[in-house]
């Protein structure tokens, strides 16, 4: 059967995460229901990133196998059957049968958005974390560089994480301020459960002035989950892009 690669965006607010769960509304479940209507039978949709409840995506990638062999129609047909879900298939391409959205990926890129102001959120409600106290973005960026590279991220590993190893390689963790908007950009081949939100929550503690810059390295080297700062809420996290080998 033809295999299709999907580029997907969604507002994760209404969903209990990506993964299909009996009796709960999930992104994978909504996509599989739409694909079943398109293809006339059960379809498994496999995603590159298994985002948590409330986490959004602007560049999630998934694959599925269909009996339908109409590449130019798949995206429009999926979007028709997805209504009124806040999920959109931006693109659908035929790919080789050995392409796997999760296991073929070589990098994943996340962005976390903080709105640093006292006033409550309006347009960004549900799409950012509002932090009313003034944050020092330069100190957060400096502290973040302690996390770049290959490390044991036990401190930032959720207790529910099922990964075999806490060792991961961050290739980028930048923090930048744009007026009252602060963006955390994080890239790695793969992540452990809630790693990005754990990192952001700890960096915000530095930004608030509750800990010095050197604290970031200290808690990393401690390899102790109890040393992690508060986990940032899911609202501000976006899976922005997934990379694959050229060709």
Swiss-Prot record:
Keywords: Isomerase, tRNA processing
CDD domains assigned to the protein according to its UniProt record, in alphabetical order: PseudoU_synth_EcTruA
Domain of life of the native organism: Bacteria
GO BP terms in the entry: tRNA pseudouridine synthesis
Binding annotation for substrate: 110
Subunit and interaction comment: Homodimer.
Function noted in UniProt: Formation of pseudouridine at positions 38, 39 and 40 in the anticodon stem and loop of transfer RNAs.
NCBIfam families reported for this sequence: hisT_truA
This protein's name: tRNA pseudouridine synthase A
């Amino acid at each position: 059967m033809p295999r299709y690669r999907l580029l997907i965006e969604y507002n994760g607010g209404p969903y209990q995460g990506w993964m299909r769960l009996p009796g709960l509304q999930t992104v994978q479940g909504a996509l599989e229901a739409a694909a079943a209507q398109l293809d006339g039978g059960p379809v498994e949709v496999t995603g590159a990133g298994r985002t948590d409840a409330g986490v959004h995506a602007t560049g999630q990638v998934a694959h599925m196998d269909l009996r339908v062999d109409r590449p130019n129609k798949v995206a429009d047909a999926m979007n028709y059957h997805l209504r009124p879900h806040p999920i959109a298939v931006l693109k659908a391409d035929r790919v080789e049968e050995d392409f796997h959205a999760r296991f073929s990926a070589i990098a994943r890129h996340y962005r976390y958005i903080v709105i640093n102001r006292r006033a409550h959120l309006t347009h960004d409600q549900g799409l950012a974390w509002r932090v009313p106290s003034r944050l020092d973005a330069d100190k957060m960026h400096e502290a973040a560089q302690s996390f770049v590279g290959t490390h044991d991220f036990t401190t930032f590993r959720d207790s529910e994480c099922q990964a075999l190893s806490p060792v991961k390689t961050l290739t980028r963790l930048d923090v930048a301020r744009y007026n009252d908007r602060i963006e955390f950009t994080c890239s790695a081949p793969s992540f452990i459960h809630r790693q990005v939100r754990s990192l952001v929550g700890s960096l915000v503690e530095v930004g608030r002035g509750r800990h010095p810059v050197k604290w970031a390295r200290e808690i990393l080297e401690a390899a102790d989950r109890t040393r992690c700062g508060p986990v940032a809420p899911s609202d501000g996290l976006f899976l922005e892009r997934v990379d694959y080998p050229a060709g």
